[in-house]
From Swiss-Prot:
InterPro entries: ADD (IPR025766), DNMT3_ADD_GATA1-like (IPR040552), DNMT3_ADD_PHD (IPR049554), SAM-dependent_MTases_sf (IPR029063), Znf_FYVE_PHD (IPR011011). It comes from Mus musculus. PANTHER family: DNA (CYTOSINE-5)-METHYLTRANSFERASE 3-LIKE, DNA CYTOSINE-5- -METHYLTRANSFERASE 3-RELATED. The gene is Dnmt3l. Changing residue 297 to A/E: Loss of binding to DNMT3A. Residues 1-39 are annotated as: Disordered. Disruption phenotype: Oogenesis in female mice takes place normally, but the heterozygous offspring of homozygous mutant females die before mid-gestation due to biallelic expression of imprinted genes normally methylated and silenced on the allele of maternal origin. Male mice are viable but sterile, with a complete absence of germ cells in adult males. Spermatocytes show asynapsis or abnormal synapsis, and do not progress to the full pachytene stage due to demethylation of methylation of both long-terminal-repeat (LTR) and non-LTR retrotransposons. This is DNA (cytosine-5)-methyltransferase 3-like. Residues 75-207 form the ADD domain. Coiled coil: none annotated. Catalytically inactive regulatory factor of DNA methyltransferases that can either promote or inhibit DNA methylation depending on the context. Essential for the function of DNMT3A and DNMT3B: activates DNMT3A and DNMT3B by binding to their catalytic domain. Acts by accelerating the binding of DNA and S-adenosyl-L-methionine (AdoMet) to the methyltransferases and dissociates from the complex after DNA binding to the methyltransferases. Recognizes unmethylated histone H3 lysine 4 (H3K4me0) and induces de novo DNA methylation by recruitment or activation of DNMT3.
Length: 421
């Protein structure tokens, strides 16, 4: 079974079904889906599925109530309390809002933790924290080829049933609670239209003014169409599986434009439409006859040409990266034009400074992953930058890749073993 320490051995032919459609239909809609899903998933035996669907029949003693998160099962089973009145993450009864993915509540501190962890990914392409409670440590990895979610041992044992983690760990292939056609596993009940719920939760509870796009079901995801300005990011897109080497008409597309001086709206409309627009200042040490601010203004101009129509519902993302060349005034201007604050990304391994970039983007998760720098940290970073005449392209590519990982929730990706740069 795949975990953060154990690579997945599951067959990558599992078919993903439209679970939102099944969840919003009749109460019996899961029955035909169960049969269809099992037939289309030969790597997953029926008895393996039963393991994660069963709730523990072990009786709970009313005279010895448990503590901590163990209270969740006790309150639901013994005290008959609605699980919506209990925080799924910590077990407190001080519920602030609803959990967006599963039936249950969230207290205020856990709500903040959930928002911060929602779109954080590790280098292996999977989410960094548990999908339910946002804890780290050793996690079960969903082995559906189109899923990036992980779950902690404690959540599956408490919410599905004691011993569930051991049974999952013994399975050759495990598919998670958001991918299975069965909406209930023990106390864990997937919400209907959970992608809508997730967007509404982020837009309502998030600290920033920028809304996110609803994540896209795997079977609806389309190949991404990218416009890359000033720098070619084809290697990054291939490493993420968005572009295939020698890709035909079925793969993603990339339009690279190095000099946009004479580009006008009709050019962009002819090349497009696009799902992602990327731009950056020139790398440190590069010979260039234009000031760094020129790249920002040109990026903003081209971005206006590429924006979808206002009534369009398709996800559209943009990202502008500064190789720490913009002055303080330029940074303020960029924030005003792009209408979002910058985030500073650092690649520090041990005590060795590798690279850093400032990023303005509407891609979700960036602000929670990279906290603002203190003035002392900013001064140290600038000193490190001045000491390097030129940053290696692979190190820049790694930072770009980390920014684009959340887009796997929106667009089709192809190669399963393409993540390392």
């Amino acid at each position: 079974m795949g975990s953060r320490e154990t690579p997945s051995s599951c067959s990558k032919t599992l078919e993903t079904l439209d679970l939102e459609t099944s969840d919003s239909s009749s109460p019996d809609a899961d029955s035909p889906l169960e049969e269809q899903w099992l037939k289309s998933s030969p790597a997953l035996k029926e008895d393996s599925v039963d393991v994660v669907l069963e709730d523990c029949k072990e009786p709970l003693s009313p005279s010895s109530p448990p503590t901590g998160r163990e209270m969740i099962r006790y309150e639901v089973k013994v005290n008959r309390r609605s699980i919506e009145d209990i925080c799924l993450c910590c077990g407190t009864l001080q519920v602030y809002t609803r959990h967006p993915l599963f039936e249950g509540g969230l207290c205020a501190p856990c709500k903040d933790k959930f928002l911060e962890s929602l779109f954080l990914y590790d280098d292996d392409g999977h989410q960094s924290y548990c999908t339910i409670c946002c804890s780290g440590g050793t996690l079960f990895i969903c082995e559906s080829p189109d899923c990036t979610r992980c779950y902690c041992f404690e959540c599956v044992d408490i919410l599905v049933g004691p011993g569930t983690s051991e049974r999952i760990n013994a399975m050759a292939c495990w598919v998670c609670f958001l991918c299975l056609p069965f909406s209930r596993s023990g106390l864990l009940q997937r919400r209907k239209r959970w992608r809508h719920q997730l967007k509404a939760f982020h837009d309502q509870e998030g600290a920033g003014p920028m809304e996110i796009y609803k994540t896209v079901s795997a079977w609806k995801r389309q190949p991404v169409r990218v416009l890359s300005l000033f720098r070619n990011i084809d290697k990054v897109l291939k490493s993420l599986g968005f572009l295939e080497s020698g890709s035909g008409s079925g793969g993603g597309t990339l339009k690279y434009v190095e000099d946009v001086t004479n580009v006008v709206r009709r050019d962009v409309e002819k090349w497009g439409p696009f799902d992602l627009v990327y731009g950056s200042t020139q790398p440190l040490g590069s010979s260039c006859d234009r000031c760094p601010g020129w790249y920002m203004f040109q990026f903003h101009r081209i971005l206006q040409y590429a924006l979808p129509r206002q009534e369009s519902q398709r996800p559209f993302f943009w990202i502008f990266m500064d190789n720490l060349l913009l002055t303080e005034d330029d940074q303020e201007t960029t924030t005003r034009f792009l209408q979002t604050e910058a985030v500073t990304l650092q690649d520090v391994r041990g005590r060795d400074y590798q690279n850093a970039m400032r990023v303005w983007s509407n891609i979700p998760g960036l602000k929670s992953k990279h906290a603002p720098l203190t003035p002392k940290e900013e001064e140290y970073l600038q000193a490190q930058v001045r000491s390097r005449s030129k940053l290696d392209a692979p190190k820049v590519d790694l930072l770009v890749k980390n920014c684009l990982l959340p887009l796997r929730e929106y667009f089709k990706y192809f190669s399963q073993n393409s993540l390392p740069l």
